[in-house]
């Protein structure tokens, strides 16, 4: 139990400290609002697409593919998104935050934490790629659609047909989805990755998380966040507790245990990804609610992930 807690703290608290550093540097005017805007733009258009491309391109999709598992990841992701979206439209009084609330409630840091968690427990991270394949493309497709249809900007309050066309265009031209598609094709074709290219891409990919986290901290508006305490708390509970509580027992009944179950823990119950904040900002949303949920899920996930690992180990689902 203590070992799991220490690992969870080591995995999540550095993310929180980077956000805190960004906030303090902004208060001291080392990081400006212009830096936040440019960092968000760079992560969205360059660093994150490169990271996802490299993660998929260097994975042997053919050798490790497990159709039922990938299908379960996709089904759980789709079901959770649609239910959260429907309930948010029904119960959120402030319709301007529906898009941010939905994305912050479902979108995990699967690509960043998945491999690290599995590797720490089993010494290999091979099955994290299957979870990423079944969830991350859907994360981004739904994010484009939801953030477009629920945009608070005036020009988005047009006819449904125009909104759907805009969503489709957003999916086709989204740099994150283009990176995923390119990486998947590269992996399927089993193309070699030249050492020079791999090192260059690795350097760019390594900038994704630090830049995004610094930007979240630097762009965090404390007073504005106070106005979103209730939706922040609800989104945090959904992200860290409700989604794992619903889908992990189902996964066990279907026979997904050991590495596959650990990957699902990350997919369902890890921190809200900083990429969600970047995408929300780039698509015309305020970003305050998303940033708040990133902070709270990062802070509390060390405890909740430890609980889920303890539960699975005590039941003999992971060894």
Language-model-detected regions and their locations in the chain:
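Alpha-helical transmembrane segments of multi-pass small-molecule/ion transporters
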Residues: 1-319
